[in-house]
Amino acid sequence: MVDSDPVEFPPENRRGQLFGKYEVGKLVGCGAFAKVYHGRSTATGQSVAIKVVSKQRLQKGGLNGNIQREIAIMHRLRHPSIVRLFEVLATKSKIFFVMEFAKGGELFAKVSKGRFCEDLSRRYFQQLISAVGYCHSRGIFHRDLKPENLLLDEKLDLKISDFGLSALTDQIRPDGLLHTLCGTPAYVAPEVLAKKGYDGAKIDIWSCGIILFVLNAGYLPFNDHNLMVMYRKIYKGEFRIPKWTSPDLRRLLTRLLDTNPQTRITIEEIIHDPWFKQGYDDRMSKFHLEDSDMKLPADETDSEMGARRMNAFDIISGSPGFNLSGLFGDARKYDRVERFVSAWTAERVVERLEEIVSAENLTVAKKETWGMKIEGQKGNFAMVVEINQLTDELVMIEVRKRQRAAASGRDLWTDTLRPFFVELVHESDQTDPEPTQVHTTS
């Protein structure tokens, strides 16, 4: 069922604007849990796509994990054939993905009008394999590749979108395989149907084979009105390649749609395939992030004081309802994590905190950015404080604490330190939207 709720605009903004940063235009797409609108940056005029997701529908559908993965994964990816995620905003009931706008629409809409020639099929397949290989090299498997998830930009170049079903390498079980049944029926690999575990890279390659077949033929290789009959065809690899297909493409399709994942062609082999190599720019397979997977853009890295400026991705990643620490952090080492928003400067917070911990005879080690590690009570207390610039006027202070009962019986956190952080909290107006959580606990 499609989410029929209207777009929720923060109350302090004019109707049709999102946090005063984006003008929200016409609806360009919708699904069971999200709607996508065309938008425009009020600062630059740049066109963006705004994907609006209902938190309530996610929670009812048990899909919080999907949205967490999509935020985490898209934030890490920088490739010309992958839709760019600019930022994530949120209110109490909605999450807003602000993404690159693909003006050309879905590849599915183009191919549904008729099959492509081999040269055009090859061009899109080259862009697809470049992006998929890039994801795999970073331990990310899409698991739901299909023409509906492939968009086109204004130059009609391909862009992969919708990473909601994607898997990370940390989801692989001890047998080295993934075990979650994912994907769209006609694109599902035979080993997924067998429910014995599968290699995420291999099933993406199978889906790429289905996509290439569709581009060349104009129809699906495995299709039947009876789902079980279709699954049997997939499992046995029963398909016919159109007679107009060239011998080189025929050989490549046969290797892509090999029902045995052990002998199925690999990304490296695809790149060296004779049909694939025609007109291929080798630079497309050599995209690297230069160790910047989780870095912010240059204008967001450091303020004049040196406190790191947070973007909305950092904020929503830290909110209790959508905690991404399992994907990135080591929060399990601490028994409590709290966040406070304050109008104090980072320098002032550090100076005052140093005075308090000095009076308590605690050991302090300063971090490179604005923050510190505090230890004391003969190893029974440890705390890490990090201060990040939220806006020009506000900072967010994250406190990670581990504490065991001290011999004195005194609770250092409850009696002394937490009251200090509560004191400096910036009290937000009651009508403010909720892109941040003020002094939250996870």
Swiss-Prot record:
Q: Which Gene Ontology biological process is one annotated for this entry?
A: response to oxidative stress
**Region (Activation loop) residue spans:** 162-191
**Outcome of substituting residue 324 to A:** No effect on binding to CBL2
- Impact of mutating residue 311 to A? No effect on binding to CBL2
Question: So what does mutating residue 319 to A/D actually do?
Answer: No effect on binding to CBL2
Pfam families the record matches:
NAF, Pkinase
In this chain the NAF domain maps to 305-329
Q: What segment(s) does the record annotate as region PPI? A: 335-365
Instruction: List residues, modification Phosphothreonine.
Output: 180
Modification Phosphoserine occurs at: 166
Q: Tissue-wise, where is it found?
A: Predominant in roots, cauline leaves, and flowers. Ubiquitous with highest expression in 7-day-old seedlings and flower buds, followed by that in cauline leaves and young siliques.
The first-level EC class reads transferase
Annotated catalytic residues: 144
Instruction: Please give the annotated consequence of changing residue 322 to A.
Output: Loss of binding to CBL2
Q: Which SMART domains match?
A: S_TKc
Q: What induces it?
A: By light in a cytokinin-dependent manner and N(6)-benzylaminopurine (BA). Also induced by sucrose, glucose and fructose. Induced by several abiotic stresses like salt, cold, heat, oxidative, drought, PEG8000, glucose treatments as well exogenous abscisic acid (ABA) application.
Q: Which PANTHER family match?
A: CALCIUM/CALMODULIN-DEPENDENT PROTEIN KINASE KINASE-RELATED (PTHR43895), CBL-INTERACTING SERINE_THREONINE-PROTEIN KINASE 14 (PTHR43895:SF160)
Q: How does it assemble?
A: Interacts with CBL2. Interacts with CBL3. Interacts with CBL8. Interacts with CBL9. Interacts with KIN10 and KIN11.
Which family does the entry's similarity section mention? Answer: Belongs to the protein kinase superfamily. CAMK Ser/Thr protein kinase family. SNF1 subfamily.
Q: What is this protein called?
A: CBL-interacting serine/threonine-protein kinase 14
**Organism encoding this protein:** Arabidopsis thaliana
Organism classification: Eukaryota, Viridiplantae, Streptophyta, Embryophyta, Tracheophyta
**What is the gene called?**
CIPK14
